Amino acid sequence: MRSGVIAQKLGMTRVYNDAGEHVPVTVLRLENCQVIAQRTIEKNGYTAVQLGVGFAKVKNTSRALRGHFAKVSVEPKAKIAEFRVSPDNLLDIGTEITAQHFVPGQRVDVTGTSIGKGFAGVMKRHNFGGHRASHGNSITHRAHGSTGQCQDPGKVFKGKKMAGHMGQVRVTTQNIEVVSTDVERGLILVRGAVSGSKGAWILVRDAVKRPLPDNVPRPAGIRQLAKEKTEMVTPVTETSEAEGAE
């Protein structure tokens, strides 16, 4: 089980696939997503990584969090979240996860907070049909009607669909397809809509109900791996040039 990521919702747009079909996508951005803490079986009883993303001003960060970030030598983060991982996918503190953590065609589960709608009636909140517009109806056109029974059971059952607060709840949408990624700009494009307003923080994980593709990076798509590959190639090139000069 790999770690998820924290992304910021930028909005929606559309792209075209190889067949020329228009695909609506939501654009998610990874900005400075780093591991800031570990949870191990020996110390905590489970394995997980704590991620921080974005940037926050020091003056707007609590003293406790300032000490937490200073302990691991990272800048204050705007958002923190914890992801359960298997022991073999545990990441080192300070590791930065990039958009290459996911691959096109992969299915992911996306979690966000839906847009709040305030106090809503049953027609908007539960898609009720409403009452008749005329023929004896008086000021009950959008009412929900009867809410209970007679003396037995003499109560309104829990879960009864009625008017009330709508939205502003945690919503997880499963099995969303990753259309494409842009590692340089830190963008992940997923098919369809994602709960949350523009600028909202979104949690993206590997889908639990779909198999993981074979070509996903393990333990994660991290920026340090790319640097190590570059450093390994550079000395070989310099050596070969020196031998040629001799």
Swiss-Prot record:
InterPro entries xrefs: Ribosomal_uL3 (IPR000597), Ribosomal_uL3_bac/org-type (IPR019927), Ribosomal_uL3_CS (IPR019926), Transl_B-barrel_sf (IPR009000)
Keyword check for RNA-binding: yes
Post-translational modification, as annotated: Methylated by PrmB.
Gene Ontology MF: a single term: structural constituent of ribosome
Residues annotated with N5-methylglutamine modification: Q151
GO cellular component: cytosolic large ribosomal subunit
Any GO BP annotation: translation
Keywords: Methylation, Ribonucleoprotein, Ribosomal protein, RNA-binding, rRNA-binding
Keyword rRNA-binding: yes
Cystines in this chain: none
TM region positions: none
Record text on subunit structure and interactions: Part of the 50S ribosomal subunit. Forms a cluster with proteins L14 and L19.
Cross-referenced PANTHER family: 50S RIBOSOMAL PROTEIN L3 (PTHR11229), LARGE RIBOSOMAL SUBUNIT PROTEIN UL3C (PTHR11229:SF16)
Family the entry assigns: Belongs to the universal ribosomal protein uL3 family.
Protein purpose: One of the primary rRNA binding proteins, it binds directly near the 3'-end of the 23S rRNA, where it nucleates assembly of the 50S subunit.
UniProt protein name: Large ribosomal subunit protein uL3
Source species: Bartonella quintana (strain Toulouse)
Annotated gene: rplC
